[in-house]
Amino acid sequence: MTKLVRGFRDIFAPESNNFAELEACARRVFTLAGGTEVRIPTLELKELFIKSTGDTTDIVQKEMYAFEDAGGRVLAMRPEGTPGTVRAYIENNFAQTAPVQKLFYIGNMFRAERPQAGRYREFEQIGMEYIGNPSPAADAEIILMIKDIVTSFGVKNYGVKINSLGCQECRPAYKQELINYLKKDFDTLCEKCKDRLEKNPLRVLDCKIDGARFKENAPKQKLCAACENHFNEVKTFLQGRIDYIIDPSLVRGLDYYTRTVFEFQAGDSAQNAIAGGGRYDSLVKSMGGADMPAVGFAMGVERTIAARGETKDNKQNKIFVVSLDKNCNAKAFEIMSLLRSAGVICDGGLFDKNLKAQMKQADRTKSSFALLLGADEFEKGVVTMRDLSSGEQQEIKFNDILNKVGKIRL
């Protein structure tokens, strides 16, 4: 028997209802903010992620599903949504035709990580890339969108951290200071961090092995005046709208971030990040596009669902149509189609089964009411509607079904 690939899973109701609910919350928030949806390919050229995500990141070095196709192209299944969205922005010439874009995506990503509780090799992300707006207001707007999504979804216990990584003007001096600090303990660094030290020392502070022991005493970022003003304005826009703490050690795990970075965490652990992102003013240009500022975020759907801590059944009144006689099948099918056309959730159609089997299926599907149609009912022009919770039942004329059922459908 063919089995599921390790690290992947099937998702059924009621758990799948949570995915649909969170997606709906996000779409509502994005739409109210003027966002438009982009659907990017699952496959991209591997080079795209090397240029954007960064060749020193774990994602590129170890976690991408990459392969050579029959045409000799090296492709990769997307490990994150930002590079593909930015590529789409560049390739479709938005910089010239409509430079300011709020592009959101909802889709599955793929990383060859070690499977563990709550973490899979295929996972869903919700994200937005706000391209073309250099204002600190855009940073704050993105952060508040995340807040609106998680609160409307029902996540109660979460915290928010923010920081500024500076820009190309002020970051080099800080990076050198950080390198000098970390070199004192070079021999104790993990192999990954030894490699990162010269290329991107900020990533050492994000390391799961070494990060914690260096964060507290690491030198603090010294922002230039422009970055200081930008960060202060972000905080002004957030004031009174969301609680947050400033964490100088927050660096995020990708190479392209500049200035503002942020992270939403469920509970107290940094390993429980449910969403994060930041500004990346150089990414569009580095990928071959115009010199275009941008800020964005990604939210882990599975992690956000886990943070809420409950699985909703989303129970709705459902009608199950039962036919007791083959001569009634056509009428039963007509009733089933009529109810669906009127927006009533309606199941049935097991007309080759006996009454017991059909009623058992009605119970399995958690139907609220059954409409029974047999020879006697057909002769009288009625159906019997049975409340499957109380057992109470009543006869309803064919021409009154919509009126009666419509009153109890939700």
From Swiss-Prot:
It is found in: Cytoplasm. Its EC number is 6.1.1.21. One of its GO terms (biological process) is histidyl-tRNA aminoacylation. InterPro entries: aa-tRNA-synth_II, aa-tRNA-synth_II/BPL/LPL, Anticodon-bd, Anticodon-bd_dom_sf, His-tRNA-ligase, HisRS-like_core, HisRS/HisZ, HisRS_anticodon. GO terms for cellular component: cytoplasm. PROSITE patterns: AA_TRNA_LIGASE_II. The keyword Transferase does not apply. Its main location: cytoplasm. GO terms for molecular function: ATP binding; histidine-tRNA ligase activity. SUPFAM superfamilies: Class II aaRS ABD-related, Class II aaRS and biotin synthetases. It comes from the Bacteria. Keywords: Aminoacyl-tRNA synthetase, ATP-binding, Cytoplasm, Ligase, Nucleotide-binding, Protein biosynthesis. It catalyses: tRNA(His) + L-histidine + ATP = L-histidyl-tRNA(His) + AMP + diphosphate + H(+). PANTHER family: HISTIDINE--TRNA LIGASE, MITOCHONDRIAL-RELATED (PTHR43707:SF1), HISTIDYL-TRNA SYNTHETASE (PTHR43707). Belongs to the class-II aminoacyl-tRNA synthetase family. HAMAP family: His_tRNA_synth (MF_00127). Homodimer. This is Histidine--tRNA ligase.
